[in-house]
UniProtKB/Swiss-Prot annotation:
Keywords: ATP-binding, Chaperone, Metal-binding, Nucleotide-binding, Zinc. ATP binds at P122, T123, G124, S125, G126, K127, T128, L129. The keyword Nucleotide-binding applies. SUPFAM superfamilies: Glucocorticoid receptor-like (DNA-binding domain) (SSF57716), P-loop containing nucleoside triphosphate hydrolases (SSF52540). GO terms for biological process: cell division; proteolysis involved in protein catabolic process. The lineage of its organism: Bacteria, Pseudomonadati, Pseudomonadota, Gammaproteobacteria, Enterobacterales. This is ATP-dependent Clp protease ATP-binding subunit ClpX. Component of the ClpX-ClpP complex. Forms a hexameric ring that, in the presence of ATP, binds to fourteen ClpP subunits assembled into a disk-like structure with a central cavity, resembling the structure of eukaryotic proteasomes. Belongs to the ClpX chaperone family. It comes from Buchnera aphidicola subsp. Schizaphis graminum (strain Sg). GO terms for cellular component: HslUV protease complex. InterPro entries: AAA+_ATPase, ATP-dep_Clp_protease_ClpX, ATPase_AAA_core, Clp_ATPase_C, Clp_protease_ATP-bd_su_ClpX, ClpX_bact, P-loop_NTPase, Znf_CppX_C4.
Length: 427
């Protein structure tokens, strides 16, 4: 009897949760016939904390919604020009999220419709940047889809559901967060119908995609395969309600102005034909785009049902030289500021003369690439010096003037020791 009692006293106590004995853990806390170790306590705390954090995220979602004035002011910090479009977007986004926040407070049971947006503007006018900046301000998931890659289900290409799948990826498959996100569909003009006339061949990347996008944009309970539906057909689907997802569609619509000009000038050709033709030439493409109507977009190749899902249409202006100069220097994340920060990492100052900045803007204007072409121009100018600089010593400043931009000379290097200007050739 004595030996058995000694054996029991020597028996090691164990954690009732993980099974580790008292020698394997730092602390072992006893309860009524139950033990828990410090490691399990820490794990339980983490689980509780994660639950609290998740709930807090859901409770705080859109707890603060900036006013249209505040939204536009924020956009002004990052996007140059396009004031009318900024106002349109600010009001549209505010109303969209105000509708979501107050859906339960609607005592009259008036159903507020969703106002998706169509942006029309040339390449490099700021369409994508506007949408990205809005999403960052509101702290909602944001994804970009390319309409040219989309096809009808069953054909080579991406299913339209992939648009929502990308949004889910951005928020780590948190469905509740994804349902409040913004989806930006670029190159929407490229899915226009190939012809006004019915065709015996199926238009799988044009009208077919428009038809497939209809329900998604309007609001539906979509079944989304987390890993893409075509390569993993056996996976479980996530149910995502798209009713509160804001869709912003954008495109250049390069031939649209011609369609509008024909409509406007039809019926005005009786007599004085020559004068009217001269007046028509004076009117810019921008003038005609400002007169856009739904029937013009139908003539372009968008189906009426699709246009109906995009009630807010706004036109972006082509950027002029002054706007491009401002884009290079003024915004918080201006290109020149970005490269100056990059050179600061090497403890070197980077300076552009006013003439150099103007010359860069003129180059981008001649290439007709808008703001998008500015980075490639600067990259080409600085390529050689960025290649050499990490291996160089005692460099104080790099100076870029107009002759450097026009490839007439090399960037000027100013050294610390003698403060002497030298060329990148190492003279």
């Amino acid at each position: 009897m004595t030996d058995k009692s000694k054996d029991n006293s020597k028996k090691l106590l164990q954690c009732s949760f993980c099974g580790k004995n008292q020698k394997e853990v730092k602390k072992l806390i006893a309860g009524p016939a139950v033990y828990i170790c410090d490691e399990c306590i820490r794990l339980c705390n983490n689980i509780i904390q994660e639950t609290k954090t998740t709930k807090k995220i859901e409770d705080d979602e859109l707890s603060y919604l900036p006013t249209p004035h505040e939204i536009k002011k924020h956009l002004d910090n990052y996007v140059i020009g396009q004031n009318h479009t900024k106002k349109v977007l600010s009001v549209a986004v505010y109303n969209h999220y105000q509708r979501i926040r107050n859906v339960s407070k609607n005592k009259d049971n008036v159903e507020l419709g969703k106002s998706n947006i169509l942006l029309i503007g040339p390449t490099g006018s700021g369409k994508t940047l506007l949408a990205e900046t809005l999403a960052k301000l509101l702290n909602v998931p944001f994804s970009i889809a390319d309409a040219t890659t989309l096809t009808e289900a069953g054909y080579v290409g991406e299913d339209v559901e992939n648009v929502i799948q990308k949004l889910l990826q951005k928020c780590e498959y948190n469905v509740k967060k994804a349902e409040l996100g913004i989806v930006y569909i670029d190159e929407i003009d490229k899915i226009s119908r190939k012809s006004d006339n019915p065709s015996i061949t199926r238009d799988v990347s044009g009208e077919g995609v428009q038809q497939a996008l209809l329900k998604l944009i309007e609001g539906t309970l979509a079944s989304i395969p987390p890993q893409g539906g075509r390569k993993h057909p056996q996976q479980e689907f996530l149910q995502v309600n798209t009713a509160n997802i804001l869709f912003i569609c954008a495109g250049a619509f390069s031939e649209l102005s011609k369609i509008i000009s024909k409509r406007i000038d039809t019926g005005n050709t009786i007599g004085f034909n020559c004068n009217l033709k001269k007046q028509k030439k004076k009117k810019s493409e921008q003038y005609f785009l400002q007169q856009v109507q739904s029937k013009d977009l139908i003539k372009f190749g968008l189906i009426p049902e699709f246009i109906g899902r995009l009630p807010i249409i706004t036109i972006l202006k082509e950027l002029n030289e002054t706007a491009l100069v401002q884009i290079l220097c003024k915004p918080k994340n201006a290109l020149i500021k970005q490269y100056q920060t990059l050179f600061n990492l090497e403890k070197v100052k980077l300076e552009f003369t006013k003439e150099a900045v103007t010359s860069i803007a003129k180059k981008a204007l001649s290439k007709k690439t808008g703001a998008r072409g500015l980075r490639s121009i600067i990259e080409n100018i600085l390529l050689d010096i960025m290649y050499e600089l990490p291996s160089m010593k005692n460099v104080e400043k790099i100076l870029i003037d107009e002759s450097v931009v026009n490839s007439h000379s090399l960037p000027k290097i100013i050294y610390e020791e003698k403060n002497k200007s030298k060329k990148a050739s190492g003279e």
